[in-house]
């Protein structure tokens, strides 16, 4: 027989559940407030004690109400936080299973896609998904099997709250760790985010991609094109993350394509720029676009990235010489439509001139003594001190260091004498470039 104390506790539980069942929206909101305040941070045994071993009876009511109301656009934040009290409690595996058995994951993912639901409510949904993902590998797999990666990535791209977007990043980071079955799916989802219109989403995706890349160890072919396109951004924080990812990617098999792509960006497509320039000429109101053309922003960022890579790894600097990077940098220095392209290209060229005597010789010869002295005196501000004729000389340069490199014997074998022996991966992509040089000459 139950004791008088136990009977009283059961009576209180039944009364509480009856109050919930009979309450309207306002009364239920008050009940949830009191529940969260009284039980936040409690363990599962403590919740059971509070509810006389009947906590699951309240949880099932919460999940049922969630499923009945989430599509109506009703406020969900208190309801989701109350469910979170159960799911985040220590030793709460039973509650978690009960929530998942009634389709909890699918409900949380559907909440992310509904326009009528408030951003704050969606943030609470993301937090519950974090709790589920952090509960173990099989729960991460369940989220991914429920098309969760796509739903979560799309929400990250569309979200207007940076705080919420950062919570989404935490969730994606959790899904990439300890999830070998679906880590490639998360990786591809992050790559798919790069072209999105949200700078914050791009920044967070790039950050998480660096982690994902180190875990997976192989690259997806589309990553090069996607990362290079991000360089057209006007947001420096996004550009920074893109360059940091590029620094990582040169250690993988996409290095040749990445270097070739960066050098190609130094000379934007004439067809694209001519379309934009003709528009500028015909409409004086868009003259300011000259400084913000995506292709020119991309050009400046590429020049900066090339400088970062060259300073980081001398072998990479040499490989870019074989891609005629000096010619392309000087051409970018002649782009009077975009001063930052001139500035970044000039700073990067300065490093190549200091590093390779053969480059110094060709640059001096092409520039002429007067322009070269200006360049040496202040490479960063050269764009402010040159006239239109000097800019044309730079833009129309025909510098080709590649042939001289072969004649002088400057190669990875010579460079290893001064800078140490390259690893096997470096030898592989050096060989790749040598083969292309021979094919071009033939």
From Swiss-Prot:
Domain of life: Eukaryota
Positions of disulphide bridges: none
Pfam families, sorted: DUF5578
Protein name: Armadillo-like helical domain containing protein 1
Originating species: Bos taurus (Bovine)
């Amino acid at each position: 027989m139950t004791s008088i104390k136990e009977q009283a506790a059961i009576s209180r539980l039944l009364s509480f559940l009856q109050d919930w069942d009979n309450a309207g929206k306002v009364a239920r909101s008050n009940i949830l407030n009191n529940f969260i305040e009284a039980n936040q941070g409690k363990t599962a045994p403590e919740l059971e004690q509070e509810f006389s071993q009947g906590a699951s009876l309240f949880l099932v009511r919460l999940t049922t109400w969630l499923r009945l109301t989430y599509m109506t656009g009703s406020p969900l934040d208190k309801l989701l936080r109350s469910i979170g009290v159960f799911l985040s409690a220590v030793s709460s595996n039973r509650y978690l299973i009960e929530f998942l058995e009634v389709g909890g994951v699918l409900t949380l993912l559907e909440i992310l896609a509904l326009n009528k639901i408030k951003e704050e409510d969606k943030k609470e949904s993301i937090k519950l998904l974090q709790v589920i993902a952090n509960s173990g590998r099989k729960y991460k797999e369940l989220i991914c099997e429920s098309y969760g990666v796509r739903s979560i990535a799309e929400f990250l791209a569309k979200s207007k709250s940076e705080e919420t977007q950062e919570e989404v990043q935490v969730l994606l980071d959790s899904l990439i760790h300890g999830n070998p079955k679906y880590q490639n799916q998360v990786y591809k989802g992050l790559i798919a985010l790069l072209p999105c219109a949200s700078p914050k989403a791009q920044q967070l995706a790039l950050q998480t991609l660096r982690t994902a890349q180190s875990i997976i160890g192989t690259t997806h072919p589309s990553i090069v094109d996607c990362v290079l396109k991000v360089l057209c951004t006007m947001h420096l924080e996004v550009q920074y993350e893109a360059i940091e990812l590029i620094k990582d990617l040169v250690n993988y098999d996409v290095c040749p394509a990445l270097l070739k792509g960066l050098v190609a960006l130094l000379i934007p497509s004439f067809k694209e720029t001519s379309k934009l320039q003709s528009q500028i000429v015909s409409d004086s109101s868009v003259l300011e676009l000259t400084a913000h053309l995506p292709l020119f922003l991309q050009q400046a960022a590429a020049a900066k990235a090339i400088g970062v890579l060259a300073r980081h790894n001398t072998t990479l600097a040499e490989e870019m010489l074989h891609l005629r990077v000096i010619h392309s940098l000087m051409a970018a220095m002649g782009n009077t439509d975009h001063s930052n392209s001139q500035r970044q290209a000039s700073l990067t060229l300065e490093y190549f001139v200091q590093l390779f005597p053969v480059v110094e010789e060709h640059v001096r010869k092409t520039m002429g003594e007067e322009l070269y002295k200006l360049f040496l005196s202040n490479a960063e501000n050269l764009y402010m001190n040159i006239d239109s004729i000097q800019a044309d000389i730079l833009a129309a340069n025909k510098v080709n260091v590649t042939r001289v490199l072969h004649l002088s014997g400057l190669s990875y074998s010579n460079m290893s004498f001064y800078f140490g022996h390259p690893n096997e991966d470096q030898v592989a992509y050096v060989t790749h470039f040598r083969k292309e040089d021979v094919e071009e000459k033939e």
